[in-house]
C-alpha cells in the first residue's frame, strides 16, 4: 500500500485534533475574558480578586456537577477517530455561568494536603481550571505522562509545571496509550479492580477515605472510554497520579485494539525504556526514585509481555550448515570441528543458557564426503581417508597464507636460478633439476604430523607447475599428495614460467653462437619433457583423484604448442633486414641527413624481432657497434653550420602606423564644363530678360549684346559674366552671324577660380579681418534690435550688416557665403563632428556670421528641441561665452524683426552649421 493509504487515518485524526484544539483554545480564550470580566465586577463590588475567583469557581463547579452526566453521555456517543491528547478546555463545555452572588455560596473547606496525598476533587478542579485558563492549547508529546499534573498550590510534592506552554502543538505525535479521559464525577460507573501493574501510589491514612471515592470510577471510566473508539479528548485531567497509573493499565489493551492511532511506531512504546532513562527525562520533581521506578517498571512488564515471545530451545534447531570455505576463512573453528566433530560457530546459542553441543548426527559425518570445498576434484583423497580412518579426527589446517608463502618461496627459488644465462644447456638443466630435487626437503614435515597434511588438503591452492617443470627426480614426484593438491591452484602461472624458461634458454643458446632451429626445438622439448603429471599422480592411491587431476595437467600441451618460435623461417623470409642495404644506397646523395633517415629504420627494432632466431642473433651487436661508430648527431651539424654561416636576412623595417592624410584631389584650375544649350537660342534674346539654361539658372550674372554689320552680313556677339556657386567667376562670349543661331559659337573669355579653395587665409589674416569688420557687423546688428531689416528675411540682416555696416569695404554676402568659412560642424545623435574632418581655422568671434542648413538642436538638460533652418537660416554672432553663443537673428517664428537669442552648438543633433569670417571686398573678385 502507498504511504497515504497507511497514514491517511493518522492525517485525518491530526486534522480533526488541530481543528478541535483551535476550537477549545478559542473557548478557553473566551473563558479567560469572562473571568477577567468577573474579576473586574468583583473589584467594583469590593470583593477581592481571590475571593471572587474562588466564588466563581465554586459556583461553576456546582453547576458542573449537575450537568456532567448529560455531557458524559454526549462524550460516550461521540467518536472522532483520533486521540489528540489535548488537555485544555473540554471541561468548559457547559454554558457560561450566570451572574450570581458569590457570597451566597459557602467557601470550600481549606485543608493542607500532606506529602504523598492527593487533594480532593473540588480543589483539583479549581487548580485545573486555573491551569486551563493559562494553557489553552497544549498537545503534549511522549513525555506528557508527567507534564499533565494539575496545578496544586498547597501540595509541594506535585507542583504545577508552567513551562509546558513552550512545547509546540503536537496533535498526532502523542500515542493512544497516553489519552486522558475526561472526568465526570457523577457518571454512574461501577468500580473496577486494579490489574497487575496498576497499584496506586500509597497515600497517608488521612486521605484513605477520600482517595478511593473517585479512583475506581476513574479507572472504570477510562477503560470504558478507551474501548469506545477513543473519542476526542480535550479535557485536562483533574487528578495526578491515579490518572497516570490508569493510563498505564490500559496501554497494552489499547495497543491491540486500535493500532490505527499509532502514527509513529518508534515512539509507541516509550514505557519500555529503562527506569533510569525515564527518571532522568520525565520524572516530576516531587517523586522520589523508588516510587517512580515502581510506577514505571511495572507498566514496562505489562507492555512487554504481549510483544516479546519466549525464546525457543536452541537444541530444537538443526545444526548450522557447513560452509565450503570454512577451513580457509576460519581455521580455528575448523580445527575444533575436526577434534570434536562439532563446529565451534554456534556458540551464540549458549547465551540463552542452552548447551553448545549439537546433535550427535554431525559426529558420524564422513569428513571425506564433506571434503574441502574449493577444488571439487580433490574432495575425495585416498590419503585423507587413510588419515581420517587412522586418527578419526580432523586436524586444523594451517593458514593458507603460509602455504602460499611457501609456494611463493619455492617459486622464487625455482625461478631465480634460471634467470642468469647458464654456461651450457646441460648445466642449466642440471641446475634446475637439482633445485627441483631440493624442493621436497621441506615437504616431509607434513608427514610427521599427519593432521597437518590433512589440514593442508583443506584449503588446496592452485597447482604449482614450477617444480613439475624443473624437477626431473623421482623424489619430487613422490612428494606427498598435499603438495600435489596445492599445485593445481597455481596452474595458471606456469605459462609465464615456461615463457621465462624459453627466454632463458634462448639467451643461453644465443651465447653459444649459431644453432639450428632443430637443435633449439630438441632442447626445448627435452626441458619440457619433465612436465609429466602422470608421475606426480602416481602417489595418489584413490581412484577418483588421479582421473580428476590428470585432465588439468593434460591441458599443458599448450606450452608444447610453444614451438611456434621454432618457426624461424619467418624472420628469414623477412627480407626487411636485407632492405637495410637501401640505407647504403641512400648514401648516393651527398646530403648526409638522408642516410640518417635511412639508418633509423635499421635500428634494433628489426633486430629484436630477429633476436629470437638463433642464426641472426649476432646482428643486434653489430648494429649497436655501427651506431656507436657512426653517431647521428654529427650529421645534422653541417646543416646547422651552413645555416650559421649563411647571413641572416635583414630585419624587416619597422612598421609605421602613422598614416598621412590623403591628398585632396587636384582642384581643376580651369573653367567647369557647363552645358549652355546653345541650340535653344536663349542668347539671341535682345528684348526682355533671358531665360538661362539649367546650369546657369540662379547664378548672379551680367551680360552685354553687340552686333556688327558688313554689307548684308550681320555678326552678333553675346557676352555674359557669371559667378558660380563656389564664388568663382566665368565669362562667355557667344557669336553667330545673321539670324542663324544654329552656327553659334561659344568661347570662355575669363575665369577666376573660387577664393574659398584658392585663397585660404592664415590665422593672422582671419584675426585681422575680424578686428577690421567684426565690430561693425555686430554693432550694426545690435542697433537694429526690434526692427525689420530689408525684406524681413534672416539673410537680409547679414547682407545689410556687411554692406551698410562696413561701408562697402567688406565682401558682401553672395549666395550663402558671407566670407571665408572658418568652421563647419555636422550634428548627429552621437555628437557634433567636423565636416570632412576639417579642423576649424579659428574660433567664432564677435561679428562672425552663422549659416544653418536643416539643423535641429536638442537640449538634454531642459528637454527642449528647436529646429533652425528650413532649409536655411542666417544669424550674426554677438558674443561667444564658451558654452553658448549669443546671436542676433531675424524672421524667427515668422516674426520678421531682429531679436537676440542664445544657441549651443554642442546640442546640434542634425544638420550643418558653417561659421564665416568677414573678408575684404576684393577677396571674392568682381564680375
UniProtKB/Swiss-Prot annotation:
Residues 223-232, 290-303, 383-395, 469-478, 618-629 have a biased composition (Polar residues). Residues 558-568 have a biased composition (Pro residues). Belongs to the AIM3 family. Residues 22-33, 67-93, 123-193, 206-222, 233-275, 401-417, 424-440, 503-517 have a biased composition (Low complexity). This is Altered inheritance of mitochondria protein 3. It is a peripheral membrane protein. It is found in: Membrane raft. Residues 22-671 are annotated as: Disordered. One of its GO terms (cellular component) is membrane raft. It comes from the Eukaryota. Keywords: Membrane. Its main location: membrane. Residues 41-60, 479-488, 571-593 have a biased composition (Basic and acidic residues). The gene is AIM3. Pfam families: AIM3_BBC1_C. It comes from Debaryomyces hansenii (strain ATCC 36239 / CBS 767 / BCRC 21394 / JCM 1990 / NBRC 0083 / IGC 2968) (Yeast). Gene3D superfamilies: 3.90.1720.60.
Amino acid at each position: 500500500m502507498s504511504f497515504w493509504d497507511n497514514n491517511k487515518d493518522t492525517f485525518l485524526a491530526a486534522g480533526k485534533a488541530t481543528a478541535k484544539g483551535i476550537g477549545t483554545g478559542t473557548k478557553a480564550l473566551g473563558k479567560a475574558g469572562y473571568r477577567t470580566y468577573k474579576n473586574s465586577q468583583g473589584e467594583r463590588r469590593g470583593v477581592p480578586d481571590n475571593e471572587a475567583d474562588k466564588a466563581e469557581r465554586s459556583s461553576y463547579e456546582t453547576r458542573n456537577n449537575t450537568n456532567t452526566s448529560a455531557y458524559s453521555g454526549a462524550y460516550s456517543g461521540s467518536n472522532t477517530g483520533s486521540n489528540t491528547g489535548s488537555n485544555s478546555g473540554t471541561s468548559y463545555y457547559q454554558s457560561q455561568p450566570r451572574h450570581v452572588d458569590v457570597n451566597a455560596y459557602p467557601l470550600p473547606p481549606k485543608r493542607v494536603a500532606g506529602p504523598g496525598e492527593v487533594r480532593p476533587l473540588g480543589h483539583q478542579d479549581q487548580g485545573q481550571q486555573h491551569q486551563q485558563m493559562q494553557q489553552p492549547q497544549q498537545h503534549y508529546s511522549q513525555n506528557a505522562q508527567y507534564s499533565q499534573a494539575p496545578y496544586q498550590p498547597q501540595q509541594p510534592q506535585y507542583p504545577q509545571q508552567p513551562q509546558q506552554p513552550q512545547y509546540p502543538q503536537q496533535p498526532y505525535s502523542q500515542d493512544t496509550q497516553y489519552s486522558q479521559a475526561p472526568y465526570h464525577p457523577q457518571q454512574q460507573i461501577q468500580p473496577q479492580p486494579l490489574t497487575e501493574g496498576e497499584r496506586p501510589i500509597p497515600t497517608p491514612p488521612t486521605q484513605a477515605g477520600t482517595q478511593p471515592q473517585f479512583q475506581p470510577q476513574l479507572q472504570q471510566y477510562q477503560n470504558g472510554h478507551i474501548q469506545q473508539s477513543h473519542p476526542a479528548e480535550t479535557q485536562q485531567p483533574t487528578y495526578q497520579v491515579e490518572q497516570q497509573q490508569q493510563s498505564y493499565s490500559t496501554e497494552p489493551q489499547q495497543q491491540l485494539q486500535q493500532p490505527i492511532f499509532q502514527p509513529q511506531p518508534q515512539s509507541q512504546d516509550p514505557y519500555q525504556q529503562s527506569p533510569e532513562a525515564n527518571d532522568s527525562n520525565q520524572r516530576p520533581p516531587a517523586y522520589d526514585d523508588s516510587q517512580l521506578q515502581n510506577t514505571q517498571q511495572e507498566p514496562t512488564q505489562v507492555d512487554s509481555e504481549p510483544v516479546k515471545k519466549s525464546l525457543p530451545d536452541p537444541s530444537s534447531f538443526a545444526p548450522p550448515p557447513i560452509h565450503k570455505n570454512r577451513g580457509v576463512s576460519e581455521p580455528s573453528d575448523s580445527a575444533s570441528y575436526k577434534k570434536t566433530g562439532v563446529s565451534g560457530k554456534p556458540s551464540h546459542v549458549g547465551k540463552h543458557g542452552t548447551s553448545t553441543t549439537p546433535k550427535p548426527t554431525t559426529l558420524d559425518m564422513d569428513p571425506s564426503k564433506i571434503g574441502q570445498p574449493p577444488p571439487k576434484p580433490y574432495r575425495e583423497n585416498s590419503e585423507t581417508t587413510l588419515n581420517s580412518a587412522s586418527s578419526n579426527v580432523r586436524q586444523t589446517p594451517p593458514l593458507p597464507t603460509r602455504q602460499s608463502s611457501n609456494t611463493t618461496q619455492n617459486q622464487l627459488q625455482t625461478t631465480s636460478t634460471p634467470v642468469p644465462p647458464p654456461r651450457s644447456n646441460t648445466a642449466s638443466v642440471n641446475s634446475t633439476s637439482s633445485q627441483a630435487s631440493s624442493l621436497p626437503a621441506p615437504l616431509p614435515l607434513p608427514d610427521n604430523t599427519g593432521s597437518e597434511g590433512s589440514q593442508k588438503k583443506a584449503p588446496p591452492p592452485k597447482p604449482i607447475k614450477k617444480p613439475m617443470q624443473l624437477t626431473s627426480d623421482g623424489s619430487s614426484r613422490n612428494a606427498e599428495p598435499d603438495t600435489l593438491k596445492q599445485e593445481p591452484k597455481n596452474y595458471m602461472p606456469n605459462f609465464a614460467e615456461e615463457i621465462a624458461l624459453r627466454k632463458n634458454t634462448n639467451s643461453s643458446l644465443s651465447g653459444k653462437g649459431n644453432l639450428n632451429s632443430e637443435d633449439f626445438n630438441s632442447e626445448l622439448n627435452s626441458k619440457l619433457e619433465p612436465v609429466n603429471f602422470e608421475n606426480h599422480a602416481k602417489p595418489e592411491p584413490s581412484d577418483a583423484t588421479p582421473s580428476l587431476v590428470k585432465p588439468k595437467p593434460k591441458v599443458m600441451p599448450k606450452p608444447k604448442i610453444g614451438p611456434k618460435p621454432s618457426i624461424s623461417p619467418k624472420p628469414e623470409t623477412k627480407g626487411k633486414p636485407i632492405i637495410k642495404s637501401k640505407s647504403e644506397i641512400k648514401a648516393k646523395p651527398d646530403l648526409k641527413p638522408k642516410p640518417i633517415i635511412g639508418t633509423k629504420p635499421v635500428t634494433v627494432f628489426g633486430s629484436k624481432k630477429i633476436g629470437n632466431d638463433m642464426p641472426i642473433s649476432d646482428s643486434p651487436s653489430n648494429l649497436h657497434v655501427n651506431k656507436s661508430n657512426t653517431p647521428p648527431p654529427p650529421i645534422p651539424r653541417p646543416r646547422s653550420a651552413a645555416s650559421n654561416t649563411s647571413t641572416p636576412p635583414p630585419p624587416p623595417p619597422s612598421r609605421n602606423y602613422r598614416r598621412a592624410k590623403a591628398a585632396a584631389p587636384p582642384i581643376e584650375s580651369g573653367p567647369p564644363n557647363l552645358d549652355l544649350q546653345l541650340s535653344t537660342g536663349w542668347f539671341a534674346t535682345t528684348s526682355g530678360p533671358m531665360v538661362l539654361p539649367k546650369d546657369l539658372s540662379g547664378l548672379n550674372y551680367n551680360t552685354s549684346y553687340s552686333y556688327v554689320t558688313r554689307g548684308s552680313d550681320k555678326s552678333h556677339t553675346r557676352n555674359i559674366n557669371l559667378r558660380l556657386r563656389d564664388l568663382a567667376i566665368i565669362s562667355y562670349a557667344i557669336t553667330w552671324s545673321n539670324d542663324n543661331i544654329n552656327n553659334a559659337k561659344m568661347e570662355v573669355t575669363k575665369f577666376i577660380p573660387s577664393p574659398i579653395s584658392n585663397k585660404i587665409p592664415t590665422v593672422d589674416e582671419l584675426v585681422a579681418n575680424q578686428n577690421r569688420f567684426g565690430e561693425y557687423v555686430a554693432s550694426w546688428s545690435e542697433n537694429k534690435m526690434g526692427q525689420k531689416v530689408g525684406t524681413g528675411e534672416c539673410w537680409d540682416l547679414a547682407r545689410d550688416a556687411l554692406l551698410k555696416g562696413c561701408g562697402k569695404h567688406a565682401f558682401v554676402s553672395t549666395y550663402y557665403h558671407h566670407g571665408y568659412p572658418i568652421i563647419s560642424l555636422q550634428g548627429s545623435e552621437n555628437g557634433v563632428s567636423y565636416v570632412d574632418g576639417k579642423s576649424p581655422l579659428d574660433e567664432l568671434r564677435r561679428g562672425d556670421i552663422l549659416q544653418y542648413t536643416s539643423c535641429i538642436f536638442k537640449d538634454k538638460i531642459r528637454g527642449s528641441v528647436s529646429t533652425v533652418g528650413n532649409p536655411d537660416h542666417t544669424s550674426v554672432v554677438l558674443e561667444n561665452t564658451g558654452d553658448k553663443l549669443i546671436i542676433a537673428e531675424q524672421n524667427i517664428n515668422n516674426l520678421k524683426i531682429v531679436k537676440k537669442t542664445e544657441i549651443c552648438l554642442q546640442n546640434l543633433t542634425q544638420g550643418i552649421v558653417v561659421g564665416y569670417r568677414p573678408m575684404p571686398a576684393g577677396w571674392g573678385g568682381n564680375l
